[in-house]
Amino acid sequence: MSKRILYKDQARKALERGIDVLAKAVSITLGPKGRNVVIDKKYGAPQIINDGIAIAKEIELKNHMENTGVSLIRQAAAKTNDVAGDGTTTATVLAHAIIKQGLKYVSTGSNPISLKKGIEKASQFIIQKISENSRPIEDVKSIIQVSSISAGNDEEIGSMIANAIQKVGKDGVISLEEGKSAITELEITQGMKFEKGYISPYFITNSEKMEVVLENPYILMTDKKITLVKEDLLPVLTLINKTNRPLLIIAEDVEKEALATLVINKLRGIVNVVAVRAPGFGDRKKALLEDIAILTNGQVISEETGLNLETITLDVLGQARRATILRDSTTIVEDKNQQAVHARCEQLKNQLLIAKSSYEKEKLQERLAKLIGGVAVIKVGAATETEMKEKKLRLEDSINATKAAIEEGIVPGGGTALVHISANLKQWAKINLSSDELLGANIVEQASLAPLHKIAENSGKNGSLIVEALEHKNFEIGYDALSNSLVDMYDAGIIDPAKVTRSAIQNAASIASMVLTTECVIVNRDKKNN
């Protein structure tokens, strides 16, 4: 296929047009009075969402040049989502503001490399100030406030997530399930998460989230490598095929021919199967497999137990209510074998008492925490499928934001922290930077006002007047869009996780710098022009 090549201003203008399209669609959702976006799906009902990254993923433009701009700014949202789990709309608004202002300077002769250096230095200054001004999150009230805001100012959901985190801990597993009624409920159940994911991406059932979800699966656990198709795999696949239930295989490894057989079975719809490598090493691997076996009421197939894959029967397989497998983790939810799990926990506590080395104690405590901690399951209730999808997206954002707040603390929300820090940045840049680097820092200083500006605009107010009203106010004073007044953001419960704000400015500056230093764009020709 022939290529289309654009240079200099022409290239940057084409990228800018695509960036404008995505930023406009995403930014209308920002703030408590932000609007929704309706997305027409190829299959099923249209989806109503106000989640930045979900909207960004849906935008594809006909013009390949402009679509490259869309892809670039989408990265700012995606990276922020990967690191902090929220703040994708803020990252998009910031990146767009830096790019728009930066391109004006580039077109009038400023050096893009010097601008980039200024942008990087300014973003590092802001990140440092966010860290200095963040408050540790210490009480349940603050947790509820963070989770409520990220869930679209829904206090009921905020309380539920705070309750879930209290019960399973900040590192605990919170799983979302589709409920069977219109009411959203929280259930604490037994389960376990371990740090191993699917061996092959061909097992994925949800390509949007890159995950595999198995409902009511059988679980095969073995400390052996699965290598032979006829001896190791066919017996269990034949058994599972008759049950019409999915299968999760946890093994030392699955070698090429055997893995290919599993993938073919999966793709052809014969058996819904996924394979993951067993967690841990050596004796610890065997112990962890035994823990999983006790949780799921199954047995580990190994030489020590006298069981083998050729003569396997259904009664040695474990069972679970649900299994969710990501690229690097697996979560199993099961609550029917409570007595055996409790006995196993007591056994581990006794082993802890006699353990001699600190390493051994640490590993035993890890295993105990996995079994005792359990899994918080939020059953999402909704009247329609469209509402269900929208609610699940809000809950995911809320869970991620709350965990981020516990990790790095909180700052005033609603774009307030960036507005106050931008005033400090202006003074610092005047003293420490010069020429085009100073211009780069000024770009970031102006862009830092953009999130609050957009929140005010979405509330029907003049963004410039709101930003001006915050000048010379204390750090905690900000704009409450719901009441249209200046308030103490901590007292009002309008707070953001510091990690989310930090990630948003960091990724926005990174992507914007790349766009500003672009001198040539090469894309495939549009079909109609080919």
Curated annotation (Swiss-Prot):
**Where in the cell is the protein located?**
Plastid, Chloroplast
Give the taxonomic lineage as stored in the record: Eukaryota, Rhodophyta, Bangiophyceae, Cyanidiales, Cyanidiaceae
Kindly provide the name given to this protein in its UniProt entry.
Answer: Chaperonin GroEL, chloroplastic
Alphabetically list the UniProt keywords: ATP-binding, Chaperone, Chloroplast, Isomerase, Nucleotide-binding, Plastid
PROSITE patterns per UniProt = CHAPERONINS_CPN60 (PS00296)
Q: What is its EC number?
A: 5.6.1.7
One Gene Ontology term from the biological process aspect of the record: protein refolding
Instruction: Give me the reactions it catalyses.
Output: ATP + H2O + a folded polypeptide = ADP + phosphate + an unfolded polypeptide
Main localization of the protein? plastid
The answer, when asked if Plastid is one of the entry's keywords, is yes
Q: What does this protein do?
A: Together with its co-chaperonin GroES, plays an essential role in assisting protein folding. The GroEL-GroES system forms a nano-cage that allows encapsulation of the non-native substrate proteins and provides a physical environment optimized to promote and accelerate protein folding.
InterPro entries in UniProt: Chaperonin_Cpn60_CS (IPR018370), Cpn60/GroEL (IPR001844), Cpn60/GroEL/TCP-1 (IPR002423), GroEL-like_apical_dom_sf (IPR027409), GROEL-like_equatorial_sf (IPR027413), TCP-1-like_intermed_sf (IPR027410)
The residues the record assigns to binding ATP are 29-32, 86-90, 414, 480-482, 496
* Oligomer status and interactors: Forms a cylinder of 14 subunits composed of two heptameric rings stacked back-to-back. Interacts with the co-chaperonin GroES.
Family as reported in the entry's similarity comment: Belongs to the chaperonin (HSP60) family.
Matching entries from Gene3D superfamilies are given as:
GroEL, GroEL-like equatorial domain, TCP-1-like chaperonin intermediate domain
From the UniProt record, which GO molecular function terms apply?
ATP binding; ATP-dependent protein folding chaperone; isomerase activity; unfolded protein binding
Which parts of the chain are coiled coil?
none
The first-level EC class reads isomerase
Question: What's the gene?
Answer: groEL
Mind naming one GO cellular-component term on file for this protein?
A: chloroplast
* Annotated organism of origin: Cyanidium caldarium (Red alga)
Task: Specify the domain of life of the species encoding this protein.
Answer: Eukaryota
